[in-house]
Amino acid sequence: MNRRRFIKASLALAAACGTPGLATLFSRNAWAQESDIADGQTRAFDFSVLQAMASELAQKPWGGAPRPLPDTLAKLTPQAYNSIQYDAGHSLWNNIEGRQLDVQFFHVGMGFRRRVRMFSLDPATRQAREVHFRPELFNYHDAGVDTRQLEGQTDLGFAGFRAFKAPELARRDIVSFLGASYFRAVDSTFQYGLSARGLAVDTFTDTPEEFPDFTAFWFETPKAQDTTFVAYALLDSPSVTGAYKFIIHCESSQVIMEVENFLFARKDIKQLGIAPMTSMFSCGTNERRMCDTIHPQIHDSDRLAMWRGNGEWVCRPLNNPQRLQFNAFSDENPKGFGLLQTDHKFESYQDVMGWYNKRPSLWVEPRNRWGKGTVALMEIPTTGETLDNIVCFWQPEKPIRAGDKLNFQYRLYWSGDAPVRTPLARVYATRTGMGSFPEGWAPGENFPTQWSRRVAVDFVGGDLKGAAPRGIEPVITLSSGEAKQVEILYVEPFDGYRIQFDWYPTSDSVDPVEMRMFLRCQGEAISETWLWQYFPPAPDKRKYVDDRQMR
């Protein structure tokens, strides 16, 4: 697997994929009456047409990398590219009076070389017309683009699109599709964070990762009062094609996407990732190694949450490990999973540029039976906040063979918190630090002579208070080492309980330690399950050094 570097905000560079014979798939046309920016020919279109298109495309060889862009676009710097702005007067639904939604397009250029085709679709007649590229759709400002090189190049297409909602119809977008099959959405804070993808291919295998492209979009024209719009997308890559339908609900406090896809495998696929998402975790309450800045925490997401098919709720805090880690959590017909940002307090981040306290969570809710598989989590070492280092997706257990057709239906919730949560006690935070000393004597006049690592897991909610008089029992399981000095502490500021223990190694191994804990009362589970992966230091580092200078 090649390590991927993702540029934050909206500049994740798209990988090179292609669409062979696409012109022939759109060729059964008749001239249409022009209206607004849609200037192409009409063609009957619905989701079944798109499925047939993707199926036909899968029978053809992949077309390879995008052809070169004009030099004036290919050599743009990120700053120059960002200065190119779509002209709001030419927005897709600009002719709808009193509209609640609108769409604008991204310019091709810089690393965005894939020419994505855009179509306007009349939902009543099911007739689609293409929107061709032309320079007058954009304001180039001081980007330094020689627009003479672009005249007449109607096949340049676009790099992607973004959607707006009233009253911010031209100023603050709420949905963005840009680069390969990446897309994002916001909640009421208008702050982008983690990204989703249409599909992941061979993310963690012995072959290079493949980044499928969305190569064409069709937008159903909404009614003026609608706050929901429908978009269809064609996906293409060397190994697979896909027909996608997105029903995007732009609510006041969140964006909900209903997604359905039909996938057609061109070849055998070692690892297929469904509903993939990518995020960033540099440091947090449980991982302090990379927090030598003024910021207490730096992350888009702090945990992987899972609602398993058997009803168990699982919380897995994220790591920024020193070496790449890939973990797979087996399940059957999962009820949901996602990367969550649960801490929304400014003081936890002290960041006036990234505003990590405003970043949304992303929750996946399967809508059909996904069968057996795993929730996959990859954590890549990163030195800072500009690299996305967290990847999560569903991997079906059944191998994908050439000629296979698959169908997945799910919802994506972009919101401050997950739309559902366990009725049991849930993990509030995970903290780690020096062990082997009595709490309240940190570390006292004398440093501990025996090395250990303290772990504190805070639980809130559920029936913790009712269970306390009857006895709360932490059930701790470790893959290696021992848990000692286990304490149960009530913490008034967050009205919950802290379970803390010291982990002592029983060998010189530096392999990751798998930790698991849940709370029990009189034999019954009263909390979700906490999972964590700890990376012990080398044996010669397992000591405390008192480096004070008293003279």
UniProtKB/Swiss-Prot annotation:
One of its GO terms (biological process) is beta-glucan biosynthetic process. Predicted to be exported by the Tat system. The position of the signal peptide cleavage has not been experimentally proven. It is found in: Periplasm. One of its GO terms (molecular function) is carbohydrate binding. Keywords: Periplasm, Signal. Residues 1-32 form the signal peptide. Pfam families: MdoG. It comes from the Bacteria. GO terms for cellular component: outer membrane-bounded periplasmic space. Pathway: Glycan metabolism; osmoregulated periplasmic glucan (OPG) biosynthesis. Probably involved in the control of the structural glucose backbone of osmoregulated periplasmic glucans (OPGs). Belongs to the OpgD/OpgG family. This is Glucans biosynthesis protein D. It comes from Cronobacter sakazakii (strain ATCC BAA-894). The gene is mdoD.
